[in-house]
Amino acid sequence: MIPQVVTSETVAMISPNGMSLPQTDKPQPFHQWQDSLKKHLKAEIKVMAAIQIMCAVMVLSLGIILASVPSNLHFTSVFSVLLKSGYPFIGALFFIVSGILSIVTETKSTKILVDSSLTLNILSVSFAFMGIIIISVSLAGLHPASEQCLQSKELRPTEYHYYQFLDRNECFAAKSVLAGVFSLMLISTMLELGLAVLTAMLWWKQSHSNIPGNVMFLPHSSNNDSNMESKVLCNPSYEEQLVC
C-alpha cells in the first residue's frame, strides 16, 4: 500500500475488505447526510418525548381520578373494565419510561439504547391501541348507563317533584363528567399512539443509518508529524495504519 499524507481530519473505514481512506479534497455527501439526519433526529425526538411524557402524565392523572370516584350502581361498571385492565397506570408508566429513554438516547446514542428505545416505542404502540379500544367501549357504555340511572330515578317514589328533578340532574352530571374524562384520556392516548409510531420510525432510521464496520477519525497532525506509513499483516483482510 502506498503511504498517504493526511492533510486534514480524515475518516478511515475499517471493513472486512480492508481500510479505505476517502479523498480529503472531495465532499462527503453521505457523511453530510448522516450528520444532517442526526441533527434532525435530535430536534424532533426531544419535542416528541416531552409531549409523550405530558400525555402519559395526563392519562395517569385521569386514571387516579377514576379510581378515587365513589362506587355508583350504574356508572361504576362503565369504567371498571378500564381500571381493571390497568391501562391508565401500566400504559402511562410505559409511555413515561419510553419518553425518558428517548431523551437519554438522544443525548448518548448507543446501539443498545437505540434498540431499547425502538422496542419500548413499539410496545407503547400496542398499549395505545389497547387503550383506544377500551376507552371507546367505555364511552359507548355511558349512554346505556345514563338511561338506566334515569329510569331508576323515575321509578323511585318521591314526595316532591323538585327532588326527583335533582336526582335526574345527578345522572346527567355523572354522564357529563365521565364523558369529559374519557374524552381527554382518548385524545391523550391517540396522541401517544401517533408519537410512539413516529418515534419508533425515527429510531428505526437511526439504527439502520450506520455503516457496518468501525469508524476511525484521524485528526490533523502537525507539519513535522505528517508522514504516515501502512503496515500490512499476513492476513490480507486486515490493515493497520500508524501515524508517525
Swiss-Prot record:
Membrane topology recorded in Swiss-Prot or TrEMBL: Multi-pass membrane protein
Organism encoding this protein: Mus musculus
Name this polypeptide is given: Membrane-spanning 4-domains subfamily A member 6B
Stretches assigned to the Extracellular side: 68-84, 143-176
One GO CC term, this protein: membrane
Pfam families reported in the protein's UniProt record: CD20
Tissue expression from the record: Expressed at high levels in thymus, spleen, and peripheral lymph nodes, with less abundant levels in non-lymphoid tissues.
Homology family: Belongs to the MS4A family.
PANTHER family linked: MEMBRANE-SPANNING 4-DOMAINS SUBFAMILY A MEMBER 6B-RELATED, MEMBRANE-SPANNING 4-DOMAINS SUBFAMILY A MS4A -RELATED
InterPro entries the UniProt entry points to: CD20-like, MS4A
Taxonomic placement: Eukaryota, Metazoa, Chordata, Craniata, Vertebrata
Subcellular location: Membrane
Residues passing through the membrane, by range: 47-67, 85-105, 122-142, 177-197
Keywords tagged on the record: Membrane, Receptor, Transmembrane, Transmembrane helix
The protein's role, per its UniProt record: May be involved in signal transduction as a component of a multimeric receptor complex.
Major localization class: membrane
Residue spans, topological domain Cytoplasmic: 1-46, 106-121, 198-244
